[in-house]
């Protein structure tokens, strides 16, 4: 069997990524289909990356500065947590990865996709996800969920305009190829979990992983 499997969960704020992962973690807290499972998040995942996360969530800054900090956090995350876990043949599931930087800083904050991709090239290296799952929902659902959780931060504020939300949603949709990147229906959170389990099971048992 190859060394580990790297899975990223993506989508706009309010789509239900974190709820999905918490539900999955409750059902499969330590392993899934024979893989020991490591759960993490971005920004964050290591002590230093979590300190950078606090800055990103609560300190106003220039969009380019924000892009650099995301890349710095990701460098620590990849090298200190993700790569070692993959070398130990674990299943690594991360709440957000590089696609979020492309969407938020590259598109919405207009730093530019090429600029953000260049910043993250060294941070990520060859450690791109084997599979990415994009949790999708409509604008009203996302807003209602963010309002109910009542934990406002600077990143949440980015997608409270429908035009920006639509831009991000369209970008995420453009990534879907149903081979490495899959779309999950986040409107129904119970159904989303079952869809994720079924699709992830298919991904982990395909011949290319053996």
UniProtKB/Swiss-Prot annotation:
Pfam families in the cross-refs: Thymidylate_kin
The domain of life is: Bacteria
The record, for PROSITE patterns, names: THYMIDYLATE_KINASE
List of residues binding ATP: 11-18
Q: Which SUPFAM superfamilies match?
A: P-loop containing nucleoside triphosphate hydrolases
Keyword Kinase appears in the UniProt entry:
yes
What are the record keywords, sorted?
ATP-binding, Kinase, Nucleotide biosynthesis, Nucleotide-binding, Transferase
The catalytic activity, as recorded, is: dTMP + ATP = dTDP + ADP
Look at the named UniProt entry and state the broad enzyme category this protein falls under.
Answer: transferase
What are its GO cellular component terms? Answer: cytosol
Q: Which GO BP terms apply?
A: dTDP biosynthetic process; dTTP biosynthetic process; dUDP biosynthetic process
Give one GO term, molecular function aspect.
Answer: dTMP kinase activity
Annotated EC: 2.7.4.9
The family classification in the record reads: Belongs to the thymidylate kinase family.
Function in brief? Phosphorylation of dTMP to form dTDP in both de novo and salvage pathways of dTTP synthesis.
User: What is the protein name stated in its UniProt record?
Assistant: Thymidylate kinase
Q: Which organism is it from?
A: Mycoplasma pneumoniae (strain ATCC 29342 / M129 / Subtype 1)
Gene it is expressed from:
tmk
């Amino acid at each position: 069997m190859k060394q580990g499997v790297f899975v990223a969960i993506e989508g706009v704020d309010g789509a239900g990524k974190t709820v999905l992962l918490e539900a999955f973690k409750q059902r499969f807290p330590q392993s899934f289909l024979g893989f020991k499972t490591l759960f993490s998040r971005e920004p964050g995942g290591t002590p230093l990356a979590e300190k950078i996360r606090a800055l990103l969530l609560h300190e106003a800054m220039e969009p380019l500065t924000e892009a650099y900090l995301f890349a710095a956090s990701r460098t620590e995350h990849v090298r200190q947590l993700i790569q070692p876990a993959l070398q130990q043949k674990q299943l690594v599931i991360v709440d957000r990865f590089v696609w979020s930087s492309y969407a938020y800083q590259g598109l919405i904050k207009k730093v530019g996709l090429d600029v953000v991709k260049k910043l993250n090239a060294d941070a990520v290296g060859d450690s791109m996800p084997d599979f990415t799952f994009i949790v999708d929902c409509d604008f009203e659902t996302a807003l209602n969920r963010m309002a109910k959780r009542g934990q406002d931060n600077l990143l949440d504020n980015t997608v409270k305009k429908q035009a920006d939300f639509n831009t991000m949603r369209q970008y995420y949709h453009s990534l879907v190829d149903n081979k490495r990147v899959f779309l999950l229906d986040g409107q129904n959170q119970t159904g989303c979990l079952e869809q994720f389990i079924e699709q992830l099971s298919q991904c982990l048992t395909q011949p290319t992983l053996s």
